Amino acid sequence: MFRDWPYLYDAEETGEVGYMRQYAEDPRAAVVLAFDGDRVVGASTCQPMASSHPEVRDAFAARGLDASRFCYFGESLLERAHRGQGAGVAFFTEREAHARRLGLTQAAFCSVVRNPNDPRKPADYTPLDGFWRNRGYVHHPDLACRFHWREVGDDRETPHLLSFWLRTL
């Protein structure tokens, strides 16, 4: 699902397994799943920011923000056929509840920054900004980090800017 706009992420399974291991090995992390019968059709992750990626922690430290107060919301992936049926709202509700149980007072996630005129952008693409604002999140474009990944069609990883959305819980 990350192969689609705006991420255009071309993942190798070995890298994804290693990435997901950080959630599996963190007793304070959570993975929320969406099912259609017995089949997983979506997943969403979170963990205390203090346990998260150095790129995320460093962005907050550079701004004088205390990472120990934040829950970092990682991925939210949902098959296209199951969107618009409440799973996205449930992903946020469950992760926010998990953060509160951990005693965390803030939630944060980041989204990739793309040129709105990029020719690879599908004509029917609808950004999720409105959905996130309806959940109470505020965009902070000046709070950002960089992650490296290989885009679909590329042969090497390149840096990508991601900006943060925050909410007090």
Model-derived regions, located:
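A short, well-structured alpha-helix characteristic of acyl/acetyltransferase catalytic modules
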Residues: 1-4
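Active-site rim helix/loop that mediates acceptor-substrate recognition in acyltransferases
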Residues: 7-37, 45
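Short hydrophobic/aromatic beta-strand or adjacent loop that forms the aromatic wall/cage
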Residues: 29, 159-164
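Conserved acyl-donor/pantetheine-binding loop and adjacent beta-alpha core of acyl/acetyltransferases
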Residues: 43-75, 119-120, 125, 143-158
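Conserved hydrophobic beta-strand within the GNAT/NAT acetyltransferase core sheet
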Residues: 73, 107-109
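Conserved acetyl-CoA-binding loop-helix of GNAT-fold acetyltransferases
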Residues: 75-78, 84-101
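Conserved active-site alpha-helix within GNAT-family acetyltransferase domains
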Residues: 100-106, 113-142
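Short beta-strand-to-coil "C-cap" segments at the C-terminal boundary of structured domains/repeats
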Residues: 166-169
